[in-house]
Amino acid sequence: MAKIVSREIRLTSRPIGMPITANFSVVQTELKPLPDQQVLVRNLFMSVDPYMRGRMNEGKSYVPSFKIGQPLEGGAVGEVVESRAKEFKPGDVVTSNFGWREYFIAAPKDLHPVSREAQPLSLYLGALGMTGMTAWVGLLVGEVKAGDVVYISGAAGAVGNVAGQLAKLRGCRVIGSTGSMEKVNFLREECGFDIAFDYKVGPVAEQLKVEVPDGIDVYFDNVGGEALEAALSALRVHGRIIACGGISAYNDEKPQPGPSNLFNIITKRLTMKGLIVRDWLDRQGEFEKEVGGYFRAGKLKNKETVVIGIDHAVEAFLGLFQGNNVGKMVVKLA
């Protein structure tokens, strides 16, 4: 194995509130010779996702915190450069959780083979990857069925737009809220949402009353905060809440008070379920078959915001909290 020099992004300090570039550093490293039963991979694309913000904090959660001075982790799709394991050969395309770096060495068990058929290969980080699977699983968690009226917050994001498209394919009426008219048009014209509105124009609760005066059956929550409170008022009796994310509060220095109308859960007999996609990895093959089929048939669109180069990876991550992405935010590394 020839000498390989790689760059990686490390966490240098824990953010307080909104992360800043000084919390991160770009470090150049030289990879060690490739051991037996290991694989050398060059990353082509890496993912940046809002959930990563939680891993930058100390404290116990469903996934360990990032360590100070160590490279960050996250979804990536790459190409095998060299292999000393029988499971892979040079040229194979794989996904992994070793993002935030240009090259890495890993055991075969930590790599997931994928086909070159999907283009661009960053699809495996978006609609055909964990964000797409999160949307798909969310509809299972929410027991979404034909005829349901489904409201999705953060609807133009990576998970939200796929959730809306899948709900439409299931025969639902779909409403989405987002943060600009550009994104409203994207939801209506490209994703097929029945209704989309800009939450910045006026109170979400009031806009929902106008757009869906008879209420909603399902709320797919990517935001929390005002959107959750509005949904609790708009939900019909026996409505369901899919608790997927809460990006409105990820950078809060102090916890914010919860919705003032939680009592609606009792009076309306609502169901609220949390969602962590890794709990559903035994269904990944089923997801790939169904959603991959939709994509190949032209029934599912994939939208990306692409940032070029590892030097701009932190910028891409911070942009998630400023609404800079339409669809999935990815960083092209090679």
Could you describe each region identified by the protein language model?
Residues 2-4, 278-334:
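C-terminal hydrophobic helical "lid"/dimerization subdomain
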Residues 203-214:
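Short amphipathic alpha-helix with an adjacent loop that forms part of the alpha/beta core around
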Residues 87-88, 144, 235:
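Short, well-ordered loop/turn sites that connect or cap secondary structure elements
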Residues 226-300, 334:
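Glycine-rich phosphate-binding loop and adjacent beta-alpha segment
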Residues 125-202:
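Mid-domain Rossmann-like dinucleotide-binding core that forms the NAD(H)/NADP(H) cofactor-binding site
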Residues 30-48, 56-100:
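Glycine-rich beta-strand-centered segment in the early N-terminal region that forms part
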Residues 97-110, 283:
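A structural motif shared across PLP-dependent enzymes of the aminotransferase-like
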Residues 117-121, 143-149, 213-215:
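Short helix-loop-beta connector
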